Amino acid sequence: MGFRINTNVAALNAKANADLNSKSLDASLSRLSSGLRINSAADDASGMAIKDSLRSQANTLGQAISNGNDALGILQTADKAMDEQLKILDTIKTKATQAAQDGQSLKTRTMLQADINRLMEELDNIANTTSFNGKQLLSGNFINQEFQIGASSNQTVKASIGATQSSKIGLTRFETGSRISVGGEVQFTLKNYNGIDDFKFQKVVISTSVGTGLGALADEINKNADKTGVRATFTVETRGMGAVRAGATSDDFAINGVKIGKVDYKDGDANGALVSAINSVKDTTGVEASIDENGKLLLTSREGRGIKIEGNIGRGAFINPNMLENYGRLSLVKNDGKDILISGTNLSAIGFGTGNMISQASVSLRESKGQIDANVADAMGFNSANKGNILGGYSSVSAYMSSTGSGFSSGSGFSVGSGKNYSTGFANTIAISAASQLSAVYNVSAGSGFSSGSNLSQFATMKTSAGNTLGVKDETAGVTTLKGAMAVMDIAETAITNLDQIRADIGSVQNQVTSTINNITVTQVNVKAAESQIRDVDFAAESANYSKANILAQSGSYAMAQANSVQQNVLRLLQ
């Protein structure tokens, strides 16, 4: 080998290798101290880009999980609030059921209504105060609210919570047909009962026979109510226009074809002769008689078949001639507030024909709290009077009482007291025509007036002219009447269904959000694992690399020392 001293190639090679090994040792120490395989872009440029993308995705998924948990918190808050509202509605329905029996007096029903009013106030209070982070949840404004639950934009879930105030829930549809005076065979069909299909009921005969009438039709409708959502009730009542006065029926007096014969009865049917005679055959006729709180005769068909009075019941019963044949009124209830669409044949025989006046109303829970409007009351089937206009009637109805109080004068048209002269009471009949609107009962708007005479203690005249309106009266609030209590039961049931539907929707969204959170949690773990594979150092492998670099550093130092000492051998050649 040659000996050169100007250029120590061996030492230079040793130094170069030592420099490279020093860099490897530095990198290894950096990885071991940080725990990261990539500490700078120079370590792995493409790997750094991938791991940064994965880290961003993992962090975003973590926030998405937090968003989802916020959504769950909101939905659970609303759900628990509505659970309390449902308990309130259950109590309201229970109290309405308690009021729906004639063992209750007006006083006790009024107390029950007061309880219901308080419950409604609390229900509304819950609806108006339930909030999350200042956002109202049950007021109806929490609609189409979005929650980002993905790593990329617009990966959202939407949540809506319907309004739960008493004015927004319980919307129930009530429809009642006109009073029926002519029977016949009826084919009744509910149109689009589920939004698509029609439901055709079995044919029903409206008559006075057993197994016929509105009762039979109501049974047919109600046994399919779970499918159609429509329920039916009926009212078949014939009521006198005034308190019963002494009189007698004719020898051929009969109800629904069953002969009762002659009956002498007293004022108010004090001896019970008229009621007893009618009730003696009630199992055959299906008609039960009673005297109401105003002393009027009330005939009721419990089974829903018609009431047909034949012969002469006597003027003392004050039965309107137009009511001698009465098949009642049919009322329909639907628990969604939408119109009840019907079709069929001979619908006039159930009061729902083209020419019939049908009362219709949709009522919310809150509306049942106050006085029930006359139109709504009629739609609920409160009244048996029909809407219409008076076309003609008495030119005047006058009453006179002397200062001695001896009673009304003979020939006055109506009389009370000892005279009992009511022979001219029905000299004229009143004709009714259809009208689009109705007034409160007894509100005679035209040609009416009262005057008092100077020499008479009491004198009154009221003219009933053609064109005057006739209708039904407003009803008292909620459960203060039997019919009202029944209606509140229907409305409360609808409100419960409404809240259950809202809660079901919330539950569906909760399940959706929970599933999404579970999914993105797994995704986040997998993304972090992938990032770790790229970014984090393998301590076992890196420890081996460090040991190698450390040994090479030591051996390199020895080699460099030896390379420098080799040049000393040149001195021996110069000795």
From Swiss-Prot:
Where does the protein end up? Secreted; Bacterial flagellum
Q: Which Gene3D superfamilies match?
A: 3.30.70.2120, f41 fragment of flagellin, N-terminal domain (1.20.1330.10), Flagellar export chaperone, C-terminal domain (6.10.10.10)
GO CC term, one of those recorded = extracellular region
Q: Which Pfam families match?
A: Flagellin_C, Flagellin_IN, Flagellin_N
Predominant cellular place of this UniProt entry's protein: secreted
Which sections of the protein are sequence repeats? 405-409, 411-415, 447-450
A Gene Ontology molecular function term for this protein is: structural molecule activity
Keywords for this protein: Bacterial flagellum, Repeat, Secreted
Instruction: Reply yes or no: does the keyword RNA-binding apply.
Output: no
Q: What is the recorded function of this protein according to its Swiss-Prot or TrEMBL entry? A: Flagellin is the subunit protein which polymerizes to form the filaments of bacterial flagella.
Against PANTHER family, the record matches this protein to:
FLAGELLIN
Family that this chain belongs to = Belongs to the bacterial flagellin family.
| Quaternary structure and partners | Heteromer of flaA and flaB.
Indicate what this protein is called per its UniProt record. Flagellin A
Annotated source species: Campylobacter jejuni
Q: What is the lineage of its organism?
A: Bacteria, Pseudomonadati, Campylobacterota, Epsilonproteobacteria, Campylobacterales
- The gene name on file is flaA
